[in-house]
């Protein structure tokens, strides 16, 4: 399993505005699994990136909201 960081907007019908971008962390095997896990939410997904090594460690140490959801 890997941890993915998802950048998204809360409303799929609105134009993406950088200042409104939110993020969340999802543990899954693939990016596709992350997208399936989030498909029922009304998110406008901007970008999904896999976190590994030093990048993952940095997010754990410096993100106030580092709560990982587990994709099922």
From Swiss-Prot:
MF terms (GO), sorted A to Z: DNA binding; DNA-directed RNA polymerase activity
Cellular component terms per the entry's GO annotation: DNA-directed RNA polymerase complex
EC annotation from Swiss-Prot or TrEMBL: 2.7.7.6
Organism domain of life: Bacteria
Keyword Transferase: yes
BP-aspect Gene Ontology terms: DNA-templated transcription
Catalytic reactions on record: RNA(n) + a ribonucleoside 5'-triphosphate = RNA(n+1) + diphosphate
Swiss-Prot/TrEMBL keywords: DNA-directed RNA polymerase, Nucleotidyltransferase, Transcription, Transferase
A Pfam family that the UniProt record links to this protein: RpoY
Quaternary structure annotation from Swiss-Prot or TrEMBL: RNAP is composed of a core of 2 alpha, a beta and a beta' subunit. The core is associated with a delta subunit, and at least one of epsilon or omega. When a sigma factor is associated with the core the holoenzyme is formed, which can initiate transcription.
Entry's family note: Belongs to the RNA polymerase subunit epsilon family.
Function: A non-essential component of RNA polymerase (RNAP).
Protein name in UniProt: DNA-directed RNA polymerase subunit epsilon
């Amino acid at each position: 399993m890997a941890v993915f960081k998802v950048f998204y907007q809360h409303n799929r019908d609105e134009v993406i505005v950088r200042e409104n971008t939110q993020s969340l962390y999802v543990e899954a095997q693939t990016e596709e699994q992350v997208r399936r896990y989030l498909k029922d939410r009304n998110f406008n997904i901007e970008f999904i990136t896999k976190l590994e090594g030093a990048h993952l460690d940095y997010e754990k140490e410096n993100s106030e909201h580092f709560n990982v959801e587990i994709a099922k």
